[in-house]
């Protein structure tokens, strides 16, 4: 391909990317892809398009070539993310470590390395690398939140609470952190403190369902309870996220049982169960389709052999 044709192809790729036509970019032939191996900006565009269209294998193949030519921290980090998505955990760890060896203060790489280490049960290493992520970037909210979650799962509630509070210090509107502090207080039997933090979580994000569920499980609800009044308003809202709606329905069902209105309690309990079954049916349908694809793949392999 002439330099002029290559320039035209490059311009076309950039235009498609600006138009968010990721599918068209992802379908670019291997021959064309290889022409841009030494052009990091175009490689990133093609890889991002592959990831947007869930063509993870294509992205992985291109990145593995790219790191040979441009062994940068960024390319190794993106390769690590691509491998992580595919549950190729050992390879992802290698890529994140390469990224960090090139750029010692790469906070995001430390954080994602820790995420993979946590996933495979290497908790001590995960704790260390979440702390490294924070050390290299003091306002890394995600690393603080992940560190808090890991401490919580390890039942180190003092450290978990401390790190959730750091999350809130960085972002006072982080409703999950308030809710999780509430859960810790509930586990420790400090129910008034738990209630306070569940309410704070609701105040920060009115449509985050989890603190409502936790609150109604903790308290006996009466009709004067402001949380109950809020629940009645929220469930009338259109376009609620289906998963959130399911939790809201369970929450108000429990509230109506407390109040003694069993008809409405069962009505919302049935609605919640229906949403749950629909979600399970959808997951089962997806699993069946995936199994069919795998089955066809192996049948085709037999035919080829």
Give residue ranges: language-model regions.
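Alpha-helical segment of the N-proximal tetratricopeptide repeat
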Residues: 7-28, 35, 45-48, 52
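Structural marker of alpha-solenoid helical repeat scaffolds
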Residues: 35, 68-69, 102, 136, ...
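Residue-level recognition of tetratricopeptide repeat
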Residues: 39, 72-73, 106, 140, ...
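Conserved alpha-helical positions within TPR/SEL1-like repeat arrays
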Residues: 44, 48, 77-85, 108-119, ...
